[in-house]
């Protein structure tokens, strides 16, 4: 490249000299001229495709800054000097590299020697420790086996043994508390006791039996501790507001697996609550509530019904509360008979209040506060007997028996009181009053009966029980009244007696009609009223027929026989007598109200009076029809009968309707 550049710079001078000497018409240089070939080569070169040439020219432009003849002539030398300087610099640099490489080579040689020495020593050590390696391998394998066995043992212990903390929880300390963790540990013991049965079906029966025995002992220890703790907790439940803790409920759930301990704990609870209920009942009777509200029940002893009601209401509330406490205590128990257990314990708890309750109710009943109050107390006792038995069933036998005894006693005294009242009525029977209305004894007795039945209707005793009581009450009260009225009216005339009996029976009927379960008695009273009404109807008809002179005529016609001859020839049945009777009968037809018996005005019921008038009028019309038929009969030999009886039966019926 330097040579070519030098020659290129020298070419123009030579060429120019040759050109001037040869002139314009000179022939071109020969192709075999070396210079020509170089020129052609240079001229034909395509610099854009020659990257090396471009790089050389770029390097040349870095130091060839002045294009002159001198610089062109010295270009070759400059290039060579520059090339030499570069080579010297390169040599100096590589000398440093060579020295570094020689140092590295020495280090590598030293390291190689060290490695060879270490390899030799390792080989020697390997040969010397071969036995140790074999032993180590065996020990590692043994260690692995032991680790596996340790894991198995740990798993076995975790499965079939308790931790020290769990053991401490189960054994605990005397009087120490029982917590949730205790029941978890107890559940763990039960689980182990059940799981260990698997070992008994394998070749590990000895271990299984030992573990089972150990768990059984732990269970007994835990149950004994739990029982002592639960017993202590139950003894502490002596407040009126009993708060059963969740832990105590869990304790009862756990103790159900030991029926004897479970029963003893329930008995302890019942004993504690029994004394609390008795104390609370006595306090309610004598001291009242906190701060004097509510007031002591004994302060209402002057009001027998409220006194008995307050005592029974307190007991009802206490019974319901104790049942709720027991339900909270046994809410987690799943064994059979929980309901029966609750009822039995409630019966034991409430048994303590029976004696003070019985004494106080007996005092009230035996004081004989009156038939109405006795009956109300009897119904009240029956209601609470039904209500409390609905809460606790029939297991609270003592309390329910006490209430039932008091109910029967009050009922007995009540009916005794009614019987005494009835005996007094019969011992001194009053004469009917002048107006033939109900006697004062009857009115007083019916007022008493109305009060009794009203209290019975308002009671909350079950329907079937109320109906049975009603029948007995009505029999005890009404039968003596009916007998008294009959005896009282026995010396009266027929119409007076019938009027008095109708009034008395009507008053009884209106009294009973207001109440339920009286339909049968109302029917009986109605039958008796109708019997006496028939008497009054006949008496009223007879009264009218007698007053108008038709009574004798009608009776004679009814008793007449054909062999006696014609009616016209019989005494007092001739045409003159009949016309006189018809004249009076016409006056009756014009004002029938003027011929009413005085007794009818004494009747209490206007409806009954109208019924008597209506039906007696029908009898009169029927009697007139028979008289009319007999007179119109030709066999009776009446002449011109139309002039004797100028009204037909239909006309008479129309006038009287």
UniProtKB/Swiss-Prot annotation:
Listed Pfam families: COG6_C (PF20653), COG6_N (PF06419)
BP-aspect Gene Ontology terms: glycosylation; intra-Golgi vesicle-mediated transport; protein transport
Bilayer topology: Peripheral membrane protein
Cell compartments where the protein resides: Golgi apparatus membrane
Major subcellular location class: Golgi
Keywords, in A-Z order: Golgi apparatus, Membrane, Protein transport, Transport
GO cellular-component term (any): Golgi membrane
Family: Belongs to the COG6 family.
Biological function: Required for normal Golgi function.
Known partners and oligomeric status: Component of the conserved oligomeric Golgi complex which is composed of eight different subunits and is required for normal Golgi morphology and localization.
Name listed for the protein in its UniProt record: Conserved oligomeric Golgi complex subunit 6
Species annotation: Mus musculus (Mouse)
């Amino acid at each position: 490249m330097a040579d070519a550049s030098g020659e290129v710079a020298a070419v123009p001078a030579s060429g120019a000299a040759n050109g001037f000497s040869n002139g314009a018409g000179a022939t071109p240089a020969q192709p075999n001229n070396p210079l020509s070939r170089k020129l052609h080569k240079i001229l034909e070169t395509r610099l854009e495709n020659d990257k090396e040439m471009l790089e050389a020219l770029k390097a040349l432009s870095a130091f060839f800054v002045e294009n002159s003849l001198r610089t062109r002539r010295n270009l070759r030398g400059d290039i060579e000097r520059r090339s030499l300087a570069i080579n010297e610099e390169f040599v100096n640099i590589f000398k440093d590299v060579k020295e570094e490489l020689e140092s590295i080579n020495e280090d590598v040689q030293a390291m190689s020697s060290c490695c060879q020495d270490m390899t030799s020593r390792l080989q020697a050590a390997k040969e010397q420790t071969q036995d140790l390696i074999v032993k180590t391998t065996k020990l590692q394998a043994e260690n692995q086996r032991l680790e596996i066995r340790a894991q198995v043992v740990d798993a076995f212990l975790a499965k079939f043994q308790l931790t020290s903390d769990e053991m401490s929880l189960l054994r605990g300390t005397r009087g120490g508390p029982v917590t949730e963790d205790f029941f978890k540990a107890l559940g763990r013991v039960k689980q182990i006791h059940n799981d260990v049965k698997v070992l008994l079906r394998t070749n590990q029966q000895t271990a299984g039996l030992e573990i089972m025995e150990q768990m059984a002992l732990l269970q007994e220890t835990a149950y004994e501790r739990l029982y002592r703790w639960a017993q202590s907790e139950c003894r502490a439940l002596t407040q009126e507001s009993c708060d059963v803790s969740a832990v105590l409920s869990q304790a009862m759930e756990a103790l159900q697996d030991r029926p004897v301990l479970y029963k003893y704990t329930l008995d302890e609870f019942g004993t504690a609550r029994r004394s609390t209920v008795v104390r609370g009942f006595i306090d309610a009777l004598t001291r009242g509530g906190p701060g004097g509200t509510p007031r002591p029940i004994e302060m209402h002893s002057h009001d027998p019904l409220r006194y008995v009601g307050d005592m029974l209401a307190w007991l009802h509330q206490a019974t319901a509360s104790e049942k709720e406490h027991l339900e909270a205590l046994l809410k987690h128990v799943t064994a059979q008979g929980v309901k029966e257990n609750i009822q039995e314990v409630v019966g034991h708890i409430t048994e303590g209040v029976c004696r003070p309750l019985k004494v106080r109710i007996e005092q009230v009943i035996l004081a004989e506060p009156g038939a109405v109050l006795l009956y109300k107390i009897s119904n009240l006792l029956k209601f609470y007997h039904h209500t409390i038995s609905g809460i606790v069933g029939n297991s609270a036998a003592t309390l329910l028996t006490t209430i039932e005894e008091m109910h029967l006693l009050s009922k007995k005294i009540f009916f005794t009181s009614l019987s005494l009242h009835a005996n007094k009525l019969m011992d001194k029977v009053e004469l009917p009053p002048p107006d033939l209305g109900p006697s004062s004894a009857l009115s007083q007795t019916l007022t008493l009966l109305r009060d009794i039945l009203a209290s019975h209707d308002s009671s909350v005793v079950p329907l079937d029980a109320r109906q049975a009581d009603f029948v007995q009450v009505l029999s005890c009260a009404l039968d003596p009244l009916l007998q008294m009225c009959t005896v009282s009216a026995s010396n009266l005339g027929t119409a007076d007696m019938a009027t008095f009996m109708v009034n008395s029976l009507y008053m009884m009927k209106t009294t009973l009609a207001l109440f339920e379960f009286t339909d049968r008695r109302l029917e009986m009273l109605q039958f008796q009223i109708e019997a006496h009404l028939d008497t009054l109807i006949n008496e009223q008809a007879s009264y009218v027929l007698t007053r108008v002179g038709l009574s004798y005529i009608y009776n004679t016609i009814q008793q007449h026989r054909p062999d006696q001859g014609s009616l016209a020839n019989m005494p007092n049945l001739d045409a003159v007598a009949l016309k006189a009777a018809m004249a009076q009968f016409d006056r009756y037809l014009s004002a029938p109200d003027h011929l009413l018996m005085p007794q009818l005005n004494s009747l209490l019921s206007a409806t009954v009076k109208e019924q008597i008038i209506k039906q007696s009028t029908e009898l009169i019309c029927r009697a007139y029809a028979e008289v009319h038929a007999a007179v119109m009969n030709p066999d009776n030999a009446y002449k011109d009968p139309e002039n004797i009886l100028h009204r037909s039966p239909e006309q008479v019926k129309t006038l009287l309707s």
